[in-house]
Design a protein with these regions (language model features):
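A short acidic, helix-capping loop that chelates divalent metal ions and anchors anionic groups
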Residues: 61, 98, 155-161
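Short glycine/proline-centered loop/turn elements that form peptide/ligand docking sites
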Residues: 171, 192-195
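Charged helix-capping and loop-helix junction motifs
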Residues: 73-76, 163-171
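Glycine-rich adenosine-cofactor-binding loop
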Residues: 167, 184-189
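Conserved functional loop/turn residues at catalytic and ligand-binding sites
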Residues: 55, 102, 145, 153, ...
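Conserved N-terminal beta1-alpha1 strand-loop-helix module at the mouth
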Residues: 2, 12-112, 121-146, 190, ...
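Glycine-rich phosphate-binding active-site loops on the catalytic face of alpha/beta enzymes
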Residues: 110-117, 150-159, 197-220
Length: 233
């Protein structure tokens, strides 16, 4: 008779294989999170198009200001854009919008819907990301069906000034504690991304490091190159 540990290992292997059908670990290398604050006269669509041209591997639409009708319209347009580049596209927090416009998935925080409830709503084939700051949160999110974790803030960030920083030691401990991919988020830039080498993350999520730059495509290319080097180090 097989031990509980062996059964748990097989279940995790099956889960990981299923996750790989929805997305590859490499898709999380450079994860762009949109922010209307950095539009500077441009449209969100044009900004996302530029970062996709530069090689962004994953896009999250984070929208706190639009009403539902405009949010839905914008989400559908950006989903089609991401599909042209074969880049996964998820919605931040708003699971109902993700369901209605058939996004590739959703990303939720600790104060949002639990991962298993998101899974029940979106179905087995959608990507579910969960934010975590502790090993306990990370392990629980994995058990509840998360496909990947966003951990941070790893550096100080003005976009979420009230969020406590996650130490390098905690980031590494989280990566060691789970079998699903982990990305770091919060205050990451081309100047400090190399400091995350050796933690076990498979990529980074950024906002201003891409969208606050004058040349979004060039900034994306540079950051992707540096992140690739960091992950391999």
């Amino acid at each position: 008779m097989r031990s509980d540990k062996e059964l748990e290992k097989d279940q995790m292997k099956e889960k990981t294989e299923h996750m790989c059908k929805k997305m590859k670990k490499e898709d999380l290398l450079l994860y762009a999170v949109t922010d209307r604050h950095w539009l500077n006269g441009e449209t969100l669509y044009s900004q996302v198009e530029k970062t996709l041209e530069g090689g962004t591997t994953f896009v999250q639409l984070r929208e706190k200001e639009l009403d539902e009708a405009h949010f839905l319209k914008e989400a559908k347009e950006i989903k089609e854009l991401c599909a042209r580049y074969r880049v996964p596209f998820v919605i931040n927090d708003n699971v109902d919008i993700a369901l209605e416009m058939d996004a590739d998935g959703a990303h939720v925080g600790q104060s949002d819907m639990e991962a298993d409830d998101v899974r029940a709503k979106l179905g087995p084939d959608k990507i579910i990301g969960v934010s975590a700051q502790t090993v306990e949160q990370a392990v629980l999110a994995e058990k509840r069906g998360a496909d990947y974790l966003g951990v941070g803030a790893v550096f100080h960030t003005d976009s979420k000034a009230d969020v406590a920083e996650v130490s390098r030691e905690t980031l590494k401990a989280i990566c060691d504690a789970v079998d699903i991919p982990v990305i770091a988020i919060g205050g990451i830039s081309k100047e400090n991304v190399s400091e995350l080498a050796g933690t076990g993350i498979c990529g980074i999520a950024v906002i201003s490091a891409i969208f606050a730059e004058k040349d979004i495509k060039k900034a994306t290319e540079k950051l992707k190159s540096l992140t690739g080097e960091m992950v391999k180090a």
